[in-house]
Regions:
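Hydrophobic residues within the alpha-helices of tandem HEAT/HEAT-like
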Residues: 1, 17, 47-51, 86-94, ...
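Structural marker for long, regular alpha helices in very large eukaryotic proteins
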Residues: 5, 9, 57-61, 95, ...
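Residue-level detector of extended alpha-helical repeat arrays and alpha-solenoid scaffolds
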Residues: 6, 10, 40, 58, ...
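HEAT/HEAT-like alpha-solenoid repeats
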Residues: 11-29, 33, 66-74, 105-112, ...
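Extended HEAT/HEAT-like alpha-solenoid repeat tracts in very large eukaryotic scaffold/adaptor proteins
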Residues: 33-47, 82-86
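Alpha-solenoid helical repeat scaffolds
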Residues: 49, 53-64, 75-99, 114, ...
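Residue-level detector of conserved catalytic or cofactor/ligand-binding positions
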Residues: 208-213
Length: 213
């Protein structure tokens, strides 16, 4: 589809989403104080498809995505559903760097949610995007490490995978200490892989010291 046609298809979707975000919009399909969250989710998914391979569409929807990210109530489950779709859209299109950081920060906030499913999908998504913007994910390292102590084994597993990915020359010593603490209480199924990763981290740390003058 030509860029001009994609942009034309985008405009009415953006306008509708703006209306849904407006407090003056008719609340006929209100759910927990949020206007028609199901339609908002569908529009975000459609925008994701349109903007995935189009710089023009991505530029056209950056502003509305920022509005959704900042104005949606995260204290409600329906709000979190909208925010998650917004995050996925931001991360899949050619979004501004600042908008990507905003999306990753939303995922970081999800890690503190009491809902296991929300924490899990946040970790899963962070694992997928850490290679895109490692620095933005690193800012949430403390919260990610807290997830190593989560009661849910699937959350601990995802947090551990993400922790491995975050290890670099500047934090290898601190993260190795965290992994050693986790090893003491880790489930049996984690120990072999965890020990291997600790050995790799230790080797990296020794190489850093060897290279130092």
């Amino acid at each position: 589809m030509r860029a001009s046609l994609l942009t034309q298809a985008t405009s009415p979707l953006v306008a509708t989403l703006k209306n849904l975000l407006s407090t003056s919009f008719s609340p006929e399909h209100d759910v927990a104080g949020i206007t028609d969250p199901f339609l908002q989710v569908k529009i975000l998914r459609f925008l994701r498809v349109l903007g995935r391979d189009s710089i023009e569409v991505s530029e056209a929807i950056n502003d509305i995505l920022a509005q959704v990210a900042t104005n949606t109530d995260a204290s409600k489950n329906v709000g979190n559903s909208i925010l998650y779709e917004c995050v996925l859209t931001i991360l899949e299109i050619q979004a501004d760097a600042g908008l990507r950081v905003m999306a990753i920060n939303i995922l970081g906030k999800f890690l503190g949610n009491r809902d296991n499913n929300i924490r899990y999908v946040a970790l899963n998504t962070l694992n997928k995007v850490v290679s895109i913007d490692t620095n933005a994910v690193q800012r949430h390292r403390a919260t990610i490490l807290e997830c190593l102590r989560d009661a849910d084994i699937s959350i601990r597993r995802r947090a551990l995978e993400l922790t491995y990915t975050l290890i670099n020359e500047s934090n290898v010593q601190a993260l190795m200490a965290e992994l050693l603490q986790f090893l003491e209480v880790a489930d049996v199924e984690f120990r072999l892989g965890l020990t291997t990763q600790i050995c790799i981290a230790a080797e990296r740390l020794s190489l850093i010291h060897i290279s130092e003058p």
